[in-house]
């Protein structure tokens, strides 16, 4: 019984030290982009304009097709 307690204690110490020694996870690309946009507000505006420039014409053509169908 004493052996099992010692094994459990060793396992617990190794597990806890592994958790504390684990490296921090790298931030997601979205979080990095958001942090960059907060640092430079104009970069965020450029990203929004890029999305609007590519997505807005597609949305307008989709609405026109739906109106013609129905």
Curated annotation (Swiss-Prot):
GO terms classed as biological process: killing of cells of another organism; monoatomic ion transport
Pfam families noted in UniProt: Melittin
Residue positions, PTM Glutamine amide: 69
Modified residue annotations for N-formylglycine: 44
Site (Important for the flexibility at the center of the helix, flexibility that is important for the stability of the voltage-gated pore) location in chain: 57
Prosegment location in residue numbers: 22-43
Keywords: Amidation, Antimicrobial, Cytolysis, Formylation, Hemolysis, Ion transport, Membrane, Porin, Secreted, Signal, Target cell membrane, Target membrane, Toxin, Transmembrane, Transport
InterPro entries with a match to the protein in the record: Melittin/Api_allergen
Expression sites (tissue/organ): Expressed by the venom gland.
Protein's cellular compartments: Secreted; Target cell membrane
GO cellular component: extracellular region; other organism cell membrane; pore complex
Signal sequence extent: 1-21
Record-level Gene Ontology MF annotations: porin activity; protein kinase inhibitor activity; toxin activity
Annotated function: Main toxin of bee venom with strong hemolytic activity and antimicrobial activity. It has enhancing effects on bee venom phospholipase A2 activity. This amphipathic toxin binds to negatively charged membrane surface and forms pore by inserting into lipid bilayers inducing the leakage of ions and molecules and the enhancement of permeability that ultimately leads to cell lysis. It acts as a voltage-gated pore with higher selectivity for anions over cations. The ion conductance has been shown to be voltage-dependent.
Protein family membership: Belongs to the melittin family.
Subunit structure: Monomer (in solution and for integration into membranes), homotetramer (in solution and potentially as a toroidal pore in membranes), and potenially homomultimer (as a toroidal pore in membranes).
Descriptive protein name: Melittin
Gene responsible for this protein: MELT
